[in-house]
Regions:
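Nucleotide 5′-phosphate-binding alpha/beta core
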Residues: 1-57, 63-205, 214-218
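Conserved AMP-binding/adenylate-forming
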Residues: 201-235
């Protein structure tokens, strides 16, 4: 009710779900685009009542053009980062003897280039926004270094990912299956090992998402060389 969108739709009078349904029509991206553009121009209190300084750029799968999704501090803290804690908690409930937090998580996202709209507003892939704003304590458990994780040139990135992580105690991995397989194969080439479990003997969890894991599961089981847990996540 403290935003322009809220005032236009009388949010102050909303008490029940039916009130909201009556006042707010189903909106597509094109309906919200003018509001989002104003937010990208630096205006506050348009769709959200705290400053928005980050936008996630979609891949444009439903139209020819990419979409820009406002990312608030609240959505990062109470959504993405809270969900990460929930996943770890649920994993430990199922696996109370886990040694997951004794090592590091190898995080492999998509293209991570960060772009500036102006001095205050930035945009990038969601994975880039989440990594760039991640709480300080997450760096204790994550590999590689953020400067490598945020690289945009994939061939160089895979090489640096491989060389910088082969001597780490990696206990979990997170990323899309396609690029993760490319990385794991490169690590075996560099080390001369037959399986990833020889490189990272304490690896116990792979968090995957983005595409169906069914076509990749057998390849992962073979290249890792020992049973581990597989969990699908989506944000």
């Amino acid at each position: 009710q403290y935003t322009e969108f809220g005032r236009q739709h009388n949010f102050k009078d909303v008490r029940l779900l039916d009130d909201f349904k009556q006042r707010v029509p189903v909106s597509e991206y094109e309906d919200l685009k003018p509001y989002i553009q104003r937010m990208m121009d630096g205006e506050d209190n348009i769709l959200w009542n705290t400053p928005i300084r980050w936008f996630a750029k979609s891949s444009g799968t439903t139209s020819a053009k990419s979409k820009f999704i406002p990312i608030s501090d609240e959505s990062l803290k109470d959504g993405h980062y809270k969900a990460s804690k929930d996943v770890i908690t649920m994993y430990y409930i199922r696996n109370p003897e886990s040694e997951l937090l004794t090592g590091k998580s190898l995080v492999l996202g998509g293209s991570h280039q960060i772009n500036m709209v102006n001095e205050e507003i930035q945009f990038g892939d969601l994975s880039a926004v989440v990594l760039q704003n991640s709480p300080f304590w997450s760096s204790w458990m994550r590999t590689p270094d953020l400067s490598i994780a945020l690289m945009d040139e994939w061939e160089e990135k895979i090489e640096k990912l491989a060389t910088s992580t082969i001597n780490e105690n990696v206990t979990s991995m997170a990323g899309v299956p396609t690029w993760t397989l490319v990385l794991l194969k490169r690590i075996l080439e560099i080390t001369g090992k037959d399986t990833i479990s020889e490189v990272w003997p304490n690896l116990e969890l792979y968090l995957h998402g983005g595409v169906s894991f069914v076509p990749y599961r057998e390849q992962f089981e073979k290249i890792i060389g020992k049973p581990i847990a597989y969990l699908e996540s989506y944000n």
